[in-house]
Design a protein with these regions (language model features):
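Short, small/polar-rich loop/turn modules that mediate ligand/substrate recognition or access, typified
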Residues: 221, 226, 274-276
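Residue(s) in the substrate-gating loop at a strand-loop-helix junction
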Residues: 189
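Substrate-binding pocket helix/loop in short-chain dehydrogenase/reductase
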Residues: 145-146, 150-158, 244
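Active-site helix of classical SDR
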Residues: 169, 205-206, 213
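Conserved glycine-rich cofactor-binding loop
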Residues: 68-69
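Alpha-helical segment proximal to the catalytic Tyr-Lys
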Residues: 174, 218-219, 272
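Short C-terminal tail/terminal secondary-structure segment
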Residues: 194, 275-289
Length: 289
């Protein structure tokens, strides 16, 4: 213990904590302890503010479909890096390995199979007891000439692009309601706003997904449940050609990591007033509408 010049004992720990405030030392150790406590609280607040800047979460749980590779895997890695427990699904076994790598889990399954969706949701709740975020990602539907695409292929596209989202949300929405909120991002395509002749099924059904995103967001906004869609342009998980690059005003393909960071923001508290939006991340390939 050391004296402060007025005969008042003050601990070296307090002196170190308050530094230049030594001239305010005083009459009792209680005042010193009070200042020390306030200094610690201020330091904790500064740490919290730094964390918020990086969209760090604590033990939130994100469910991600088609997460075995490409954008889905990049999103899983980004969310895991910002603090989420991840629950992954993909048709291949790659989501299983990635889930284990990221400290979560994965299953092999398809968004077109209701039993697989049930398994993913049920296992997530069994392991973690909650679901805070959903990323509805899928593969690509059949392509073909506009009138040559068969009814079966149109139905397959509907199953893959739109009904998968409906099915997931039927199961997760009651969980969100019980928890008091949740956030969803649907991965779509720029073709929802600018249809591409080589991919009519994707163009038409992703436009339908944009409408459904708005409908869902409006219906559940009052319950603190948000839904947005991200509409990527050409991303580096696709084969890159000079012809495609020439179409993109930004002069390059997008990166899966850029999509992942956009998704992480939309799921964060910082995007708490953003819902019902279809957000293009496309290097300006779609002209203003």
């Amino acid at each position: 213990m050391a004296a402060d010049g007025k005969g008042v004992a003050a601990s070296s720990g307090c002196r170190k904590t308050i530094g230049w405030r030594q001239k305010y030392w005083f009459d009792s150790r209680n005042r010193c302890a009070y200042i020390t406590t306030m200094a610690r609280r201020m330091a904790a607040a500064r740490r919290r503010n730094r964390n918020e800047e990086h969209i760090v979460t604590v033990e939130k749980v994100a469910l991600i479909t088609a997460a075995g590779k490409g954008m889905g895997a990049a999103i899983a890695r980004e969310l895991a890096a910002t603090g989420y427990r991840v629950a992954l699904m993909s048709p291949s076994g790659s989501a299983v390995a990635l889930g284990e790598e990221l400290g979560g889990f994965g299953i092999q399954g398809s968004v077109t199979e209701e039993a697989d969706i049930d398994k993913l949701v049920q296992e997530t709740i069994a392991r973690y007891g909650r679901i805070d975020a959903v990323v509805n990602n899928t593969g690509h539907p059949p392509k073909g000439e506009l009138l040559a695409i068969t009814d079966d292929n149109w139905h397959a596209g509907l199953d893959l692009i739109l009904l998968n989202v409906v099915r997931v949300m039927r199961r997760v929405t009651p969980i969100f309601q019980k928890q008091g909120g949740g956030a969803v991002v649907n991965i779509s395509s720029f073709a929802a706003d600018a249809p591409e002749q080589p991919m009519p099924v994707s163009s038409a059904l992703r436009a339908a997904l944009s409408a459904w995103t708005r409908l869902y967001a409006e219906r559940y906004a009052a319950e603190n449940i948000r839904m947005n869609a991200v509409l990527p342009g050409f991303i580096d998980s696709w084969p890159e050609t000079p012809e495609i690059v020439a179409r993109i005003p930004a002069g390059r393909f997008g990166k899966t990591g850029e999509i992942a960071k956009t998704v992480a923001f939309l799921l964060s508290d910082g995007a708490g007033y953003i819902t019902g939006q279809n957000i293009r991340v496309d290097g300006a390939i779609v002209k203003a509408l």
